UniProtKB/Swiss-Prot annotation:
Enzyme Commission no: 7.1.1.-
Keywords: Cell membrane, Membrane, NAD, Quinone, Translocase, Transmembrane, Transmembrane helix, Transport
Protein name according to UniProt: NADH-quinone oxidoreductase subunit K
Gene: nuoK
Transcription regulation found in the keyword field: no
Protein location: Cell membrane
Family, similarity comment: Belongs to the complex I subunit 4L family.
GO terms for biological process, alphabetical: ATP synthesis coupled electron transport
One MF annotation (Gene Ontology) recorded for this entry: NADH:ubiquinone reductase (non-electrogenic) activity
Function recorded in the entry: NDH-1 shuttles electrons from NADH, via FMN and iron-sulfur (Fe-S) centers, to quinones in the respiratory chain. The immediate electron acceptor for the enzyme in this species is believed to be a menaquinone. Couples the redox reaction to proton translocation (for every two electrons transferred, four hydrogen ions are translocated across the cytoplasmic membrane), and thus conserves the redox energy in a proton gradient.
The protein's enzyme class: translocase
Principal location: membrane
Topology of this chain in the membrane: Multi-pass membrane protein
Length: 99
C-alpha cells in the first residue's frame, strides 16, 4: 500500500478526533477523541519511519502509547470523580468543581 494512503488515513482520523473534541460535551467522548488524535499521530510517525527506513518514528510512537496509557488511567479517574460528584460526565459541570 502506498504511504500516502496511510498519511491520508492519519489526517482523516486526526480530523475526526478534533471535530469530536470541539463538538461534543461528554467528557468520555472527548477523551476517546483525544486518544483517536494521538493514534493518528502515531500512524503518521510510523509511516514516516517506514518511508525513511529508520526506527525513530516507531520509537516515538511507542513512547506516545506509553504516555497515552498513563493519560487513560489519570483521565478516567478524574472523569469518574466528576461523575460521582455531579452525576454527569458533561464537561460544563467540571468547571463547578472549584466551588
Amino acid at each position: 500500500m502506498n504511504p500516502d494512503n496511510y498519511l491520508y488515513l492519519s489526517a482523516l482520523l486526526f480530523t475526526i478526533g478534533a471535530a469530536g473534541v470541539l463538538l461534543r460535551r461528554n467528557a468520555i467522548v472527548m477523551f476517546m477523541c483525544v486518544e483517536l488524535m494521538l493514534n493518528a499521530g502515531n500512524l503518521a510517525f510510523v509511516t514516516f519511519a517506514r518511508v525513511h527506513g529508520n526506527l525513530d518514528g516507531q520509537v516515538v510512537a511507542f513512547f506516545t502509547m506509553v504516555v497515552a496509557a498513563c493519560e487513560v488511567v489519570i483521565g478516567l479517574a478524574i472523569i469518574m470523580t466528576i461523575f460521582r460528584t455531579r452525576r454527569s460526565a458533561n464537561v460544563d459541570a467540571a468547571s463547578l468543581l472549584r466551588h
